[in-house]
Amino acid sequence: MCRFVDAIKSLLDESDITTLVALANRLSPFRVDYRRVVVGDALSVKPILVLEHEQPPCDGAWRSAAHINLGLGAAQQQHHPVPTRAVHGAAVGGVQCDGLASPPVSNNVMSDGTVDGDDDDLGYDQDTLYNQGTDYENEGGAVGQDGLPAPDAGLFQECMFSHRSASTPRAGGHGESYCQEVAQSSHAITCRELLERCILPNFEINHLENCESSTSGGIHHCLPDEHSGMTGLARNTPSASPVENSITVELDGALEIATDVRTGKFNTLRAAKRHRRNTSSLRLSSHDAGCVGDARSSAGVVKSPARRSTAVSDAALRKVKYAARTCIRADYFQFLEANLPRWVRDGIWGKEWSPNQTANVDGYENLQKAYWHVCRLDRQMRDDAIRSRMAMVLLHLEYENTCLSWKTCAHSGKKPVTKVGRGNISSLIDNIIENTHPEWRTADPGERSELRAKFHDRKRYGKRWWMLVKPLGSSILMLCSSKFAGMIKNTTVTAAMINEIKLAIQRSETGLMSLLSLANPIAESLFLDQGYDGHNAEQVLKALRAARLEVAPGEGVA
């Protein structure tokens, strides 16, 4: 039994949201229900497992994700603080009792904005956004198990934006600040406890530290300290270090959330797309917009085709600025002064391509050559980062060119022999790997899969560098710092972030583009391995000396 409990804990700690949703969906005949319990003088929301046929859900109770489809998009003009007001003598189920009551809140999602008139073009029926079966007619709220008020659908949202409404009069006319009462209680439920005890469908909230309710802080004191691909929180607190991990605000398999820079309000997918056409990037700029739950959050989201947000968070933008500031190695001039004369004389690639490597590569010799260079550099010149970057970019370009040639039937060479489950391109890659790695012929299926994975990994890295080479020029491959190269190789730096890095370098006022432009002609010749002997190294160095760039100190060599 202990091992079963440990296994479940490990699953909950390590699995992604997809795995957890699958687990929740397979709990039948059990389901997750929520029960309010009173601990001392404070309210606690406790998730419990119940058998479907033994304890059917009460009318008005907040049902689990398997029974309710909550969504984003509805807007109401009022907020309700955390429902913790003690009510003595409240009528619950016709019985007079003491306990805690909550405001009459429906399952509709609350927002501090107005109804987005463009929500009707999202591609799904707006009527499915809400649960229509819950009725909160009584002041005491719906009645749950054990004679206690059932939890509201807005309970989690109310805690999330309680720091806004701490001093806001209640919609029903009450002016008390109930969230302050909770914070002052020694037994009050904290945001951390609420997040631990509530299931938030389709969201994953990772690494919440130091998350305590307070009269002055609220939920924006929850500071995640590690990157997460799906997180419901974004940190806006300025950082003392520019190299923090990226925190993105995006929903996996659900509706995207973006922020209007002018109003600080969250928009739906279409509004976000329109806004992205008018601004270079979307960022969470206001302190109040620091949490998804502040404006248009709920305990669930409308299920729609999976989309990824192209917006970049505040923390990611700080990382982008740091990358742009440190993209050039600090010793770039000394480095070029020592190597440029030799490169102009001999080129950068060194060993000539061996003709005997072209066996069985009719029609895709260039792709074979590019991959041969990548592998040779890995084996013999592990310290030669510049040539490795150039080789990976060439591998990506030749692969794209070869695929285009095959797909458009422009290829006139002999097609490789295909096998079951292996098409033309896959068989072509197998031939290239076989020509490069002699051990391919005796490798088992697992070893062959590993060699294929290495091929595609190098090609993907080349594609990421090509995203920078195309707008900035080949000199970025030659002059970049080791920190910058590490960021580009790190897959947590998304394609959207690489695009922002490119824009930041282009808009830099420190002379970055001037420096790269001066080095681009000779870098391109070295990259293409042609015409490099026609450049005058002394003139290039003289121009670079006149355009000396102030770079961040302490940047390591590439």
UniProtKB/Swiss-Prot annotation:
Superkingdom field: Eukaryota
Keyword tags: Nucleus, Transcription, Transcription regulation
Entry's localization field: Nucleus
Keyword Transcription regulation: yes
Its biological purpose: Transcription factor that regulates the expression of the gene cluster that mediates the biosynthesis of aurovertins, fungal polyketides that exhibit potent inhibition of adenosine triphosphate synthase.
Protein name: Aurovertin biosynthesis cluster transcription factor aurF
Organism this protein belongs to: Calcarisporium arbuscula
Gene giving rise to this polypeptide: aurF
Keyword check for Cell membrane: no
Knockout consequences: Blocks the expression of the aurovertin gene cluster and impairs the production of aurovertins.
Family per record: Belongs to the POU transcription factor family. Class-3 subfamily.
Cellular compartments per GO CC: nucleus
